[in-house]
Amino acid sequence: AWVQRRLQMGDRYGMHLHLFHDYVESAGVTLRKEPNWGDNGTGYGVPLAAYTKDEQVRLIQYGLDLLFANGVPKTTLFRAGGWYANLDTLAALEELGFTADSSARTKYTFGRNKLPGYWDISPTMKPYYPSRTNQNRENPANEFPVLEIPDNGADSYAYSAADMIKRFTLNLGDGILTEPQQVTYLSHPHWFDDKEQARVRELFTYIARYNNADDHGPVVYSKTNVIADQWSN
């Protein structure tokens, strides 16, 4: 009911998937426990990309079916748990009719096992359609029809306010913007403690200096689905 109320108010949602063991088994997919970035045996740390393309289709479709069965309409937005999306993930999203993904980020390792990810984009990367052979690059002649909206502003759990402000200033540049740019920040509400809230307040206090609504600069706050519509082919 809460989700439905938010949708009625104009909010949109995207699917964010972690592969807990009971979820994978309920989806009818053979369970995998490796690779794992480090969890307590629940499957939370097993990346979606550990599974084949066809398995990923089944896992994602199962989640869509569960949502629909509980009165939540299908979404066309996605972000992989731990950002672990690969070319098979993008192919699965294409097959299932997703229009945008927000898993792309700068190069990283994650978790106590320091599992490397598949992304290696610039912090100033704009939304793009990934190449079918290199998800970190564009290739208009051979691209996925799934718009990649990079998580280029970093996340408030692992990064300091100064780090996130630096990402903003890199994307803002030194002069007048001559074309659109976007910066996406990520937070995890279930561990959004006082320290993290303070980092976010510091970040957005800084960004507010450039608010377009106050005639101070180019900053307009938006939602992922709006960005997807504005940047789509």
Region locations from a protein language model:
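C-terminal domain-boundary segment and adjacent tail
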Residues: 100, 163-233
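Short, surface-exposed basic-aromatic patches at helix termini and helix-loop junctions that form
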Residues: 4-7, 70, 86-99, 205, ...
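Metal-dependent polysaccharide deacetylase catalytic core of the NodB/CE4 family, i.e.
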Residues: 1-86, 144-145, 153, 180, ...
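Short catalytic/ligand-binding loop motif for oxyanion handling, primarily in non-cytosolic enzymes
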Residues: 21-26, 84-89, 108-112, 157-158, ...
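Conserved beta-strand termini and adjacent loop/short-helix elements that scaffold enzyme active sites
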Residues: 16, 103, 152, 222-227
